[in-house]
Amino acid sequence: PEDSIPFDESIQTVDDINLAVIGIYDTFKSSSLYSGSLTLLPDLQTDLVYGVNGNTNIYGEIWRWKDILATNTSIEGVYAALYNVINRCNFLLDRVDNVRKNTTNDDDLDLIDQCCGEAYFARAIAYSELVKLFCKAYESDEDAANQLGVILTRHYKGNEEMKRASLKDSYQFILDDLDLAAELLALDKDFQPTGKDALYNTAAFFNEY
């Protein structure tokens, strides 16, 4: 678009970083994620959902557990929305050092760290959902090293190879992001313990394997 901001001119201030984090949270409000398909579709596959005569067959293939193709628009929407979250996180993390090097106020530096911690946590959540939905279960380190994981990207504008990593590497990527989030969020004296509980609960889910 003609009014778009070039990458190298974006996120210049601490306020910009804070707004970028708000944008990440806003992306989670997608109708394909927790307020829509990501919550609805698994519920439709439970034993308590029944198809009735005269139904319109909306979500029919999901309910039947068959003929679920990669071109299913609901599933495409979930996949795209999760990577949209990841891209926003990568965008912020790629630009944050430019602001940090020009910031001298300690409170502002702490806020930058907090925002980065939230971005790492958001990226870990998005990748954890992708792994849960599109990968096989983690049986063992040896097996996971030979199973397909998800496409891992650390940068918004990079020359990273767009191919699926191993399941083992995908899990490790998520755990590394959670470790970074825990380290950075711990620096914020106002960070709520309930938020940290959510972080460690996510980490525990992956560490149990």
Regions found by a protein language model. Give the residues of each.
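A structural signal for short, hydrophobic/glycine-enriched beta-strand patches
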Residues: 39-72, 157, 202-209
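Membrane-proximal, proline-rich intrinsically disordered regions
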Residues: 1-45
